[in-house]
A protein has these predicted regions:
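Conserved glycine-rich cofactor-binding loop
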Residues: 5, 12-14
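Rossmann-fold scaffold of SDR-type NAD(P)-dependent oxidoreductases
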Residues: 9, 82-89
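NAD(P)H-binding Rossmann-fold N-terminus in SDR/SDR-like oxidoreductases
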Residues: 14, 18, 92
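Aromatic pocket-lining residues of Rossmann-like dinucleotide-binding sites
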Residues: 23
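Conserved glycine-rich Rossmann-like NAD(P)H-binding loop of the short-chain dehydrogenase/reductase
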Residues: 26-43
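The beta1-alpha1 cofactor-binding region of Rossmann-like NAD(H)/NADP(H)-dependent oxidoreductases
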Residues: 38-39, 59-71
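Rossmann-fold cofactor-recognition segment
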Residues: 48-64
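Conserved mid-core segment of classical short-chain dehydrogenase/reductases
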Residues: 69, 92-100
Length: 100
């Protein structure tokens, strides 16, 4: 059976990174999307590759449509297909609960 090809948006930290780690060790190829967390995503890539996963990185600001549109074609070309898209990207801003 051929490796599953997965894209995870917002995968450098928190939930996205946890999702990627949960797939480590399975027969998968993963494209990790990130925007500002380059250091974190490179560390994650190394971790996943140590489990035998093939990993690709793409930086894109999803608030800019032209950058967002590049993710799927990039992943499709690198992984030679796409089986699953996990839309996890978000904006996370720490703030005091009383400010909501």
């Amino acid at each position: 059976m051929e490796a599953k090809k997965i894209v995870i948006t917002g995968s450098a930290t928190r939930i996205g990174a946890a999702i990627a780690k949960s797939l480590a060790g399975y027969d998968v190829k993963i494209t990790l999307h990130y925007n500002k967390s380059a250091k974190e995503v490179k560390k994650l890539k190394d971790e996943l590759e140590n489990f035998g996963s093939e990993v690709f990185l793409i930086k894109a600001d999803l608030s800019k449509i032209m950058q967002a549109k590049k993710i799927i074609p990039f992943a499709y070309k690198k992984m030679k297909g796409l089986d699953c898209l996990i839309n996890n990207a978000s904006i996370f801003e720490k703030d005091d609960l009383s400010n909501f």
